[in-house]
Amino acid sequence: HTGGPFSSLDFTYVLYNDFLKYDPDDDQWFDRDRFVLSPGHESALLYSMMCLIGWLDIKDLKEFRQLGSKTPGHPERGLTPGVECTTGPLGQGVANAVGMAVSEAILRNQFSEDIVSHYTYLLHSDGDIQEPVAQGAIALAGHWGLSRLIGYYDANKAQIAGKVSRSDTTDYKMFYESNNWHVQEVDGQDREAIRSAIRIAQMEIEKPSIIIGHNVIAPGCATMEGNHNTHGAP
């Protein structure tokens, strides 16, 4: 699955480089920010970040999708340092992230912001948002006003069998707004726009936030940019 990691790269890089709060010496630090990669098939992107932090090494990347490695095809909680939850089934990670944001809100209210104060960041794909489990979780997050939840929608308009428009023409900006989310739209390859959008989302105190990153699959790949076949091709 090469195309998706390319289109999700700019957001993920900006998040880890400029915003995500974590301890490189302790991946289980209790007040770390959480990041959930809902499209688990984009695991190569996540493992690359783990390698740059130092939680994985080049040898682990070379063993990608090999039996017994720390870098399976889909991220597994408890196997790979820095993986917050096991993802793969589309939509599941969205619900996982909402659950983490609920936990943060409960603990923050119980123990105060001096002890618990972190964000839950979510990245989801076109396929994730089409799943009922994701849509139900999104509705719940908006209803409860989980303002420490910040999502990024990698809208690259491609799925493994073809263009998204073949099967779905939902207006997801309107969908999110109708579920009480703060919505921003950016160019998914514009890192400064992404930085600005995350800063604005962090200032929102009444609603969860979603940043819709308009993109194409496999951006920058000279012969394959925009080609849905990169979704599942090596």
Model-derived segments and spans:
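Short catalytic-loop micro-motif centered on adjacent basic/acidic residues
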Residues: 1-2, 122-124, 182-187
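Cofactor-binding active-site loop characterized by glycine-rich and histidine/acidic residues
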Residues: 5-144
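Structural motif
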Residues: 36, 119-124, 150-152, 210-214
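Flexible loop/turn segments at secondary-structure boundaries
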Residues: 44, 129-131, 158-161, 192-194, ...
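Short secondary-structure boundary/capping segments
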Residues: 52-53, 136-139, 165-170, 201, ...
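Conserved thiamine diphosphate
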Residues: 108-116, 164-197
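A short, conserved beta-to-alpha structural element at the edge of catalytic cores
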Residues: 141-168
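Glycine/aspartate-rich loop-and-adjacent alpha/beta segment that forms the canonical ThDP
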Residues: 174-182, 191-234
